[in-house]
């Protein structure tokens, strides 16, 4: 098949307008390959809006002169002035020059005869095709209209018309190809037959055939026509689809060739983009009698995608059979931002094509990717055909270049030509039409002609591709002994290059300059080698060819070399610098001076230099590093658990490393032996023994030796500060990893785990362990009590809980438990609890379960109340001015006992358990317990005692389900001394009137007695004699001896 036009035919004007309204989006960034975008051949012709470039073709003229031409259709071009026609369309031929405006209009003489045919707006140039070297040219006008008359009424038939011209683009009347009418449609029929067939919407040549597409035939079902010439015989073929439906557009695009479904016979491939609304491609073969028979139909997969609007044939995998590419420019995937597709069907050795594509290429949304597709030949001369795909509505238009291989078309484009980067003012819809497969500048590489709707065509010429066929990189010596290095050289590297042209042109001997970069130890920082005369491990150089050249470079070892085990990798990469034009000049610039390296070749080479090592004859060290590790105490005792508290400050880790020979491993030197420790944030490196063996950053690195010798042993003792253990810490994990640059494949990381038992530290204290109180007054029963003051004297205990330093945060609860003396042994109330309040970061009541606090619901007193003084209490118990029962008193003759003790441990009191949770708080928490002495119990049962002492216990403990958190219980005692204030009984008081009466009666009685004595002469004075007699008698009485004296005198 010749290099005919390979753009998708564009028939109706309405369709063209719709395409122009599409918005470009997306993009693809691909490194350029060998289509040159600097030295473009750009042509502009026609009047503005002529659509110059709507169709394009490359043509080689060999008659009358030797030259290459760029053919471009301008279907909206103005007519040659004749006074009757305004617009007909045109075809321009453009020479291969550096000028933009030297195109000539092709001479196709069409006379205007409105009575028989209409050439106004016939779209001449909608199709342009070349038969190849020394071949003819085909030009079509699909809107050419014939006029039929029925009486005075005319009927118009848009049958279309195609013109064949000679190799020199002139009419040769002796050539049957050119003089044949090529009128395949019958204008005497209507649109239901071929009266509106629009012949020439697509068309092309082979060596002995010319073919046309007519998508308007049979109510726009469409048809395909072919004229075949064999020597003097001429045969016409056509295809009428048996399906009874219109609007399929068969013939919208056509390609004809062999090695499709038969190695010799030709196969017609025609697109029908509206077949069943999803589009299809028909494969037809010749039948006797001039018919084309349908052999296979490939259907599209999406409604409205216009599958089949562009097709191309190319042997992608070099199996000798032509493969098929089908464009679907309106294909879309909304979620993936895809717009346009190319379906690739690989030929199954001439039997058929698979129903589903082997590859589906996508373009960006709104790009119309696949609106044009063309086989452009082997542009890089790698032996495989290449493909160009147009995306005219992506920005200002783009053309994607795909290469192929033995497996078919490569998925990723090798080059993307961006219309906006070409620097052409007014350019748009770049890539609307494509034509290739011809080397127009004769440099052995086919070129590509690209058309647009903006009155521009652009020729992209292929640059020569250079293969580097001989590249060597040889170090000397290959095994380096640092002891043999000199001040000027340790390693010498020799590198050599040679090239050829991929097209195999033996005359191509251009002087090219190859830039190369050598880098020593690229994967290591810092590198171990540097180039002589420099401190750098990188060297940049240039080679000038075509003759093979070699170069030698000297390298030196860096100072303080540590790694002498791993080889030094010396890498080389090279490139061909972009050469800028020497100076402006007239004429078309040859691209032979601007070659490009073959991108399919590896542009990098490397070699390595080994170190001389004491590791056996193979120079390969096989170490046997082994390690034991454990957490230990300061007495070197192994720890399985860490009993942590805030007093713990240090933790020790003992590590033993050996490198000894075993039956399985030789235990040779371990180069760059390193121990890496990954420790949790709770541990901070404090010290290492031996000193300086380890360095800490986020990870701890301990250098064991370089090398760590055979049979060497080493012990490390690492001390850590424990700084971050919390209640959430269940364990401490340390990962230990031995590493060496020697060969050892069993160096697995060791995970060392130390369980942590966290011991909370807090305190429990009291403001006053022992309180003073009293009892006395009257006995009152429960039913008579209304307020807590009716119970008895108040008590107030204050407990203080020290802060833990760290909140439990849901891991447990700190609880204050009280062993509270609640009753005496006979069940009577003892100390009646009225209220418990917790004060920390706030204040709230504590309500232990069991309704043990103020169970009688008595009215609480003012929180500010304090116990009354004994004097005040005595006055309150004074019955003189009050009412009610008299206070209980002690018998005046009875003396009370001194003291008794009530405690639950002796059974003389019964206790209940009260619990109050202590909140997480960084401050001291106060727990206040208020109670009342049950006065009646003490009056009834302990009235005989001066003092009753009641004892209780308080315990602070931790309640948690986590076994690693614990706390030592804190216990304290509390008590109250309750003194008796009962008074002794007093004598009964006598009424005043009785006293007055008694006094009066006494005085009266005394008077009577005196009177009586007086009457009896008691008050009369005695005589002198009687007086003296009395005195003498008294004296006699005084002088009488006593009985004792008398008894004494008897002896």
Swiss-Prot record:
The gene is ITGA3. Residues 855-889 are annotated as: Disordered. FG-GAP repeats lie at residues 38-103, 110-171, 185-235, 236-292, 293-354, 356-411, 415-477. The chain crosses the membrane at residues 992-1014. It is found in: Cell membrane; Cell projection, Invadopodium membrane; Cell projection, Filopodium membrane. This is Integrin alpha-3. Antibodies against integrin alpha-3 ITGA3 protects epithelial cells from invasion by the fungus R.delemar, a causative agent of mucormycosis, and could thus potentially be used to treat mucormycosis disease. Isoform 1 is widely expressed. Isoform 2 is expressed in brain and heart. In brain, both isoforms are exclusively expressed on vascular smooth muscle cells, whereas in heart isoform 1 is strongly expressed on vascular smooth muscle cells, isoform 2 is detected only on endothelial vein cells. Residues 1-32 form the signal peptide. GO terms for molecular function: collagen binding; fibronectin binding; integrin binding; laminin binding; metal ion binding; protease binding; protein domain specific binding; protein heterodimerization activity. It comes from Homo sapiens. Keywords: Calcium, Cell adhesion, Cell junction, Cell membrane, Cell projection, Cleavage on pair of basic residues, Disease variant, Disulfide bond, Epidermolysis bullosa, Glycoprotein, Integrin, Lipoprotein, Membrane, Metal-binding, Palmitate, Phosphoprotein, Receptor, Repeat, Signal, Transmembrane, Transmembrane helix. Ca(2+) 1 binds at residues 315, 317, 319, 323. Belongs to the integrin alpha chain family. PANTHER family: INTEGRIN ALPHA, INTEGRIN ALPHA-3.
């Amino acid at each position: 098949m010749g290099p005919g036009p390979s753009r998708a035919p564009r028939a109706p004007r309405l369709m063209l307008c719709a395409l122009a309204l599409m918005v470009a989006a997306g993009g693809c960034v691909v490194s350029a390959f060998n289509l040159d975008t600097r030295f473009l051949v750009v042509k502009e012709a026609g009047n503005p809006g002529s659509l110059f470039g709507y169709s394009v073709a490359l043509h080689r003229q060999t008659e009358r002169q030797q030259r290459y031409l760029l053919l471009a259709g301008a279907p909206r071009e103005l007519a040659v002035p004749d006074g009757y026609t305004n617009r007909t369309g045109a075809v321009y031929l453009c020479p291969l020059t550096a000028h933009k405006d030297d195109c000539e209009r092709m001479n196709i003489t069409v006379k205007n005869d409105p009575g028989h045919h209409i050439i106004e707006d016939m779209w001449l140039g909608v199709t342009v095709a070349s038969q190849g070297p020394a071949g003819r040219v085909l030009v079509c006008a699909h809107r050419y209209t014939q006029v039929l008359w029925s009486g005075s009424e005319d009927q118009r038939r848009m049958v279309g018309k195609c013109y064949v011209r000679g190799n020199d683009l002139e009419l040769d009347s002796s050539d049957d190809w050119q003089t044949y009418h090529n009128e395949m449609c019958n204008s005497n029929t209507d649109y239901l037959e071929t009266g509106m067939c629009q012949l020439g919407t697509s068309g092309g040549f082979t060596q002995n055939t010319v073919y046309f597409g007519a998508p308007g035939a049979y109510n726009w079902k469409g048809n395909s026509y072919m004229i075949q010439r064999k020597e003097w015989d001429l045969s016409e073929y056509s295809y009428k689809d048996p399906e009874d439906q219109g609007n399929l557009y068969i013939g919208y695009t056509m390609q004809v060739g062999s090695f499709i479904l038969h190695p010799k016979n030709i196969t017609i491939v025609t697109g029908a983009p509206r077949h069943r609304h999803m589009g299809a491609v028909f494969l037809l073969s010749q039948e006797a009698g001039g018919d084309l028979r349908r052999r296979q139909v490939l259907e599209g997969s999406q409604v409205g995608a216009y599958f089949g609007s562009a097709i191309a044939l190319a042997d992608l995998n070099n199996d000798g059979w032509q493969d098929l590419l089908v464009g679907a420019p309106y294909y879309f995937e909304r979620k993936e931002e895809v717009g346009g597709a190319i379906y690739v069907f690989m030929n199954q050795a001439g039997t058929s094509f698979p129903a589903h594509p082997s590859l589906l290429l996508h373009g960006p949304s709104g790009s119309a990717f696949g609106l044009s597709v063309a086989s452009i030949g082997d542009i890089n001369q790698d032996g495989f055909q290449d493909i160009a795909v147009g995306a005219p509505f992506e920005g200002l238009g783009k053309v994607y270049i795909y290469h192929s291989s033995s497996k078919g078309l490569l998925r990723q484009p090798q080059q993307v030509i961006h219309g906006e980067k070409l620097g052409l003012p007014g350019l748009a819809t770049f890539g609307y039409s494509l034509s290739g497969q011809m080397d127009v500048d004769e440099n052995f590489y086919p070129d590509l002609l690209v058309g647009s709707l903006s009155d521009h065509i652009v020729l992209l010429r292929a640059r020569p591709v250079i293969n580097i066929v001989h590249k060597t990189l040889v170090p000397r010596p290959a095994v380096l002994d640092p002891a043999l290095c000199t001040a000027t050289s340790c390693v010498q590297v020799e590198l050599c290059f040679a090239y050829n042209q991929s097209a195999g042109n033996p005359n191509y001997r251009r002087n090219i300059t190859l830039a190369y970069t050598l880098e020593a130890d690229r994967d290591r920082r810092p590198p171990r080698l540097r180039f002589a005369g420099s401190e750098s491990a990188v060297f940049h150089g240039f080679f000038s060819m075509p003759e093979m050249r070699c170069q030698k470079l000297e390298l030196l070892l860096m100072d303080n070399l540590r790694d002498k085990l791993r080889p030094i990798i010396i890498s080389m990469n090279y490139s061909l610098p972009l050469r800028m034009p020497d100076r402006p000049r007239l004429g078309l610039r040859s691209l032979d001076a601007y070659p490009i390296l073959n991108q399919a070749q590896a542009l990098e080479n490397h070699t390595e230099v080994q170190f001389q090592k004491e590791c056996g004859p193979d120079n390969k060290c096989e170490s046997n590093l082994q390690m034991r590790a454990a957490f230990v105490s300061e007495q070197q005792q192994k720890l399985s658990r860490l009993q942590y508290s805030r007093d713990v400050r240090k933790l020790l880790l003992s590590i033993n490393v050996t490198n000894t020979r075993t039956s399985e491993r030789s235990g040779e030197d371990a180069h760059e032996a390193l121990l890496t420790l990954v420790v949790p944030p709770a541990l901070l490196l404090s010290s290492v023994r031996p000193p300086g063996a380890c360095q800490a950053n986020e990870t701890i690195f301990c250098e064991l030796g370089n090398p760590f010798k055979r049979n060497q042993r080493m012990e490390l003792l690492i001390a850590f500060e424990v700084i971050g253990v919390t209640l959430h810490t269940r364990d401490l994990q340390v990962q230990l990893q031995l590493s060496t640059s020697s060969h050892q494949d069993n160096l697995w990381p060791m995970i060392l785990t130390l369980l942590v038992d966290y011991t909370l530290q807090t305190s429990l204290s009291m403001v006053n362990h022992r309180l003073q109180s009293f009892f006395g007054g009257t006995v009152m029963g429960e039913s008579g009590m209304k307020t807590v003051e009716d119970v008895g004297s108040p008590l107030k205990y204050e407990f203080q809980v020290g802060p833990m330093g760290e909140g439990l945060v849901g891991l447990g609860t700190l609880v204050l438990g009280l062993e509270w003396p609640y009753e005496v042994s006979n069940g009577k109330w003892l100390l009646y609890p009225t209220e418990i309040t917790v004060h920390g970061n706030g204040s709230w009541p504590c309500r232990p379960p069991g309704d043990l606090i103020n169970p009688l619901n008595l009215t609480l007193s003012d929180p500010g109340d304090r116990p009354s003084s004994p004097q005040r209490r005595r006055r309150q118990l004074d019955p003189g001015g009050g009412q009610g029962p008299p206070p209980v008193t002690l018998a005046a003759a009875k003396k009370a006992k001194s003291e008794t003790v009530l405690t639950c441990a002796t059974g003389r009191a019964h206790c209940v358990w009260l619990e109050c949770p202590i909140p997480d708080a960084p401050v001291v928490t106060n727990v206040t317990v208020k109670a009342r002495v049950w006065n009646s119990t003490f009056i009834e049962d302990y009235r005989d005692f001066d003092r009753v002492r009641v004892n209780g216990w308080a315990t602070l403990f931790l309640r948690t389900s986590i076994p690693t958190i614990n706390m030592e219980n804190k216990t304290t005692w509390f008590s109250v001394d309750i003194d008796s204030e009962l008074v002794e009984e007093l004598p009964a008081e006598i009424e005043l009137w009785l006293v007055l009466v008694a006094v009066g009666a006494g005085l009266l009685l005394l008077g009577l007695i005196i009177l009586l004595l007086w009457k009896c002469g008691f008050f009369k004075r005695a005589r002198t004699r009687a007086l003296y007699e009395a005195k003498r008698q008294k004296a006699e009485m005084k002088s009488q001896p006593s009985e004792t004296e008398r008894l004494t005198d008897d002896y």
